[in-house]
Amino acid sequence: MFPPVEIMDTTLRDGEQTSGVSFNAREKLSIARLLLEELHVSRIEIASARVSQGEQQAVRAIAEWAAAKGYADRVEALGFIDGGVSLDWLGTAGCRVVNLLAKGSRKHCEGQLRRTPERHLEDVRAEILAAVDRGMKVNLYLEDWSNGMRRSPDYVYAMLDGLADAPVSRFMCPDTLGVLDPYDTERFCRDLVERYPSLRFDFHAHNDYDLAVANTAAAVRAGFHGVHVTVNGLGERAGNAPLSSAVAVLHDRLGRTTGIDETKINRVSRTVESYTGIRIPANRPIVGASVFTQCAGIHADGDSKNNLYFNELLPERFGRVREYALGKTSGKANVLKNLEALGIDLDEAAMRKVTERVVELSDKKEQVTAEDLPYIIADVLRYDPVDTPVRILNYSLSLAQGMHPVATLRIEIHGCAYERTSAGDGQYDAFMRALRQIYREQLGREFPMLRDYTVSIPPGGRTDAFVQTIITWEMDGREFKTRGLDADQTEAAIKATVKMLNIIEINYTDNGC
């Protein structure tokens, strides 16, 4: 039985080296809490020493929280071989574990430091002992280790020989430039495990050749004890190994345990996405918006017949649900799945007509979503216009320089009219505040959580171009999207919101007005 693989998340240190990404102290503490308390990663790396006063304050806040929770030994920070300057900086911030950065290749040692390997080894040993004297635990990075193993393995062995008896908890082996493939990764890692069976090794992947996850798995297969990841694959250049994919591969393909709570992965990924402003690609495994969406009708049909198109990556594992897209490759099965979710039942002839219309609209490059189905049904079956339970009677939005925007809303819900006025940080925010007041104060009902808000405008630069707003909502643990289209962005958002209201009001018939 293999021991659990240690997952060290370096989103707050290496992930912050992504171009355009910078976390403030509050965001760092929030992410640290999610990683340790919800995801249950083994360790986190939260900062580099000597960056700024603000960074030191962030380290102090996390260190104080971690100490109070009993997590102090699971919070680490990067330090340098600089005669104790980094150690003083981290010690002042309350950090108890330092990840010292040594050179893992002869080229880096001689070319960047202008040191002989022997002198560098002396400096590293002195820094390790200085950290221990300060009561700190030490891990050691061998920067550019992958190129060291490729071009100067004798240098790597000399470093490890000289430090094997030093008080180092883990030797951390980075593929700093992302040059390894899984075959070399496994070969180099196994070499170290066999040469130094008493030492603990971590592998730190970079994704320049899109091999970070494969290399991470190869390192564990070779016997490494821990791996480094980041949420959403953040990191220098092409990024690091994404936590979501690395954990899934270790669990499913290698049969290893990590202690990670998979059901929290999606939530943590979305939180980090909101802090960084870097969108998760829709097709990113595990956490992308489209990865649990079946588009082909044959897949939806197979899922209805003993789950023929399922694999081990079930969406429920990651706190998500399977969806079925509507488009020109959709068959009757996709339409049926969406109608079932809406609680609508059609006969065979009606189903065929609706499916044909969905394909026709998709051929015209029109996007069809589940909330459009009632309107499509009304059109193709010549029903009266859909009797929507929610109608906007009128509203007023005001915007003045130096003042908060104000919205006055009058809305009809199941025949009852309600009116509210509210200020907000923007016109749509004011509209939503007024709407929430109606739901919570007058209806006494919960209101969906707005999870995501995206706006797209066709290329061309015209000020009168149509704006498409897609809003993701969450209610009762279920996420769904609505879409609005208008030349005005706020109007588009309001249209998407009204569609959401008509979806949630299906289950209500009378407000008692």
Predicted feature residues:
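Mixed-charge, glycine-accented linear interaction segment located at domain edges/termini
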Residues: 479-513
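Non-catalytic terminal/interface segments that mediate subunit docking, oligomerization
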Residues: 17-18, 22, 27-31, 36, ...
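Short, ordered loop/turn segments at secondary-structure junctions
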Residues: 12, 48-49, 80-82, 102-105, ...
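N-terminal active-site wall of soluble small-molecule enzyme domains
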Residues: 50-70, 75-78, 82-87
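A mid-to-C-terminal "edge-of-domain" accessory segment
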Residues: 4-11, 250, 254-421, 461-468
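Alpha/beta enzyme core
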Residues: 2-7, 13-43, 64-70, 83-139, ...
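Catalytic alpha/beta core domains of metabolic enzymes, predominantly
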Residues: 177-180, 184-305, 309-311
